[in-house]
């Protein structure tokens, strides 16, 4: 519900009053939207006019809301946040089906991530040994070839 109210002064003050409802309570607000003068009028007279319009509006009653705070634990014990006990559950970062469990105790029966890491380290160690043996064979073969050239 909105009304348009004008004031009778040498100039005109147009106010826009609107009524709003919030949770069963009714509020009415007034806002000056346009002030125009044909002659010079003191600012004091304009303010009196606006005050008059504001007092002529309907008074609003505000219902106070009450809130009841209920304790979650009737015995008064304070509960802290739930911490991870290391049992199953989703880890923070889960790649595939494995991944090492959820942050706390290691992961329980889900050991695929550790097995994969161990396998990769074992493979790299094997490749390192294989490369050492390959280099040693080449050096021996090259040394033997050089000796044969000098003997002929």
Swiss-Prot record:
<dbReference type="GO" id="GO:0009507">
    <property type="term" value="C:chloroplast"/>
</dbReference>
<dbReference type="GO" id="GO:0009658">
    <property type="term" value="P:chloroplast organization"/>
</dbReference>
<comment type="function">
    <text>Restores fertility in rice varieties with LD-type cytoplasmic male sterility (CMS). CMS is caused by genetic incompatibility between nuclei and mitochondria within male reproductive organs. Corresponds to the functional allele of RF2, which is dependent of the presence of Ile-78 in the japonica cultivars Fukuyama and Owarihatamochi (AC F1SZ42), and indica cultivar Kasalath (AC F1SZ41).</text>
</comment>
<feature type="transit peptide" description="Mitochondrion">
    <location>
        <begin position="1"/>
        <end position="52"/>
    </location>
</feature>
<keyword id="KW-0496">Mitochondrion</keyword>
<dbReference type="GO" id="GO:0005739">
    <property type="term" value="C:mitochondrion"/>
</dbReference>
<feature type="region of interest" description="Disordered">
    <location>
        <begin position="52"/>
        <end position="99"/>
    </location>
</feature>
<protein>
    <recommendedName>
        <fullName>Protein FERTILITY RESTORER RF2, mitochondrial</fullName>
    </recommendedName>
</protein>
<dbReference type="GO" id="GO:0010027">
    <property type="term" value="P:thylakoid membrane organization"/>
</dbReference>
<dbReference type="InterPro" id="IPR040299">
    <property type="entry name" value="RF2K-like"/>
</dbReference>
<feature type="compositionally biased region" description="Polar residues">
    <location>
        <begin position="52"/>
        <end position="69"/>
    </location>
</feature>
<keyword id="KW-0809">Transit peptide</keyword>
């Amino acid at each position: 519900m909105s009304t348009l109210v004008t004031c009778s002064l040498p100039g005109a003050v147009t106010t826009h009053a609107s009524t709003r409802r919030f949770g069963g309570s009714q509020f009415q607000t007034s806002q000056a939207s346009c002030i125009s003068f044909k002659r010079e009028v003191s600012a004091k007279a304009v303010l009196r006019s606006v005050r008059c319009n504001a007092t002529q509006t309907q008074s609003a009653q505000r219902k106070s809301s009450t809130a009841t705070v209920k304790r979650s634990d009737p015995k008064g014990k304070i509960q802290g946040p739930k911490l991870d006990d290391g049992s199953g559950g989703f880890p923070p970062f889960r790649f595939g089906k494995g991944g090492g469990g959820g942050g706390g105790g290691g992961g329980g029966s889900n050991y695929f991530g550790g097995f994969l890491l161990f396998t990769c380290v074992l493979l790299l160690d094997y490749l390192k040994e294989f490369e050492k043996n390959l280099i040693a064979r080449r050096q021996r073969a090259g040394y033997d070839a050089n000796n044969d050239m000098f003997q002929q």
